[in-house]
Amino acid sequence: MKAGIVGLPNVGKSTLFNCLSNAKAQSANFPFCTIEPNIGVVNVPDTRLQTLEELVKPERVLPATVEIVDIAGLVKGASKGEGLGNQFLANIRETDAILHVLRCFDNNNIVHVDGSVNPIRDKETIDIELQLKDLETVEKKLEKVGRAARTGNKEAIKEKEVLDGVKNALEQSKNIRSLELKEEERLEYVKPLQLITDKPVLYVCNVDEAAAKTGNAYVDQVKEAVVGESAGLLILAVSIEADINELDSFEERQMFLEDLGLDEAGAAKLIRAAYSLLNQQTYFTAGEKEVRAWTIPVGTSAPQAAGVIHTDFEKGFIRAEVISYEDYENYGSEAKVKEAGKMRVEGKEYIVQNGDVMHFRFNV
């Protein structure tokens, strides 16, 4: 599960990446300081995991993770290979979701690549480059499909019809994630193309300290611009996150946040938002040796969830013993949950719920 941080040079994305991963990507005030994509594996903040640790007292605890990639800065003309364009577009294609950082603050000491602060223009600059790259991909596919359609192949005719609609949308500067398509059309004809503008996106509005809680006029412009785009939006003061990163203890960080009137670090909110953006949820396994959070897509069946641990678990699945997280917390132990008759035995058809504590029975 991989999310890529993108944005024009000097919008704060490498600083944000540093805050998320504590990996010290070179954060300089000039374009292209991130030439190779920096990759960080980031723990997903989850208070339920802490509670299970306190109740079970295991030897170790393993949280769910998201891979965050800081992708090299983009400029106009990237789709034609300008700047680091080709590399940027190859790196972003490999991600599952996009975290698009927009500069929503004024600061004369930080140069803007286009000379002035305008988050809508910045968004459009990146959108256009991604749309042009997607258009290139779709046109190549249409050449092939068009030849088959001309022979009267019904499947090819249907595919051409869908892809013509996709091409038309891109030519009108529309992102494919907001294009209305039947689910089967999207799955069969669009998903295999791995179009960049079809990936889920979270717009991260990088504001100054004064706007950290409620946003500002720049954020309002972005909110208006992304209506109907099936996108998420998060307000974040990257400079505050950088300051928090310098504090050693949890207590110091909490005091710092309270002084600013914030309930938690923006980085934690962002990681959870990325997790949600990817339509992921968590189930837990809890034993003396290990308490662990496992990542699965929403709608996963019990055998598929077992397969995340090991493929043998899925192949030989017999049943799952399931405790809801709420029951585990309320009763305080697996034994007490069993006594209360709250442990359920579920079969192959069971759809795992967010927060389920599970134990699998299987046959190899």
Please place each PLM-identified region on the residue numbering.
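C-terminal-of-GTPase-core extension/linker across diverse P-loop GTPases
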Residues: 2-6, 11, 17, 144-351, ...
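Short amphipathic alpha-helical segments
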Residues: 28-29, 110-114, 215-217, 247
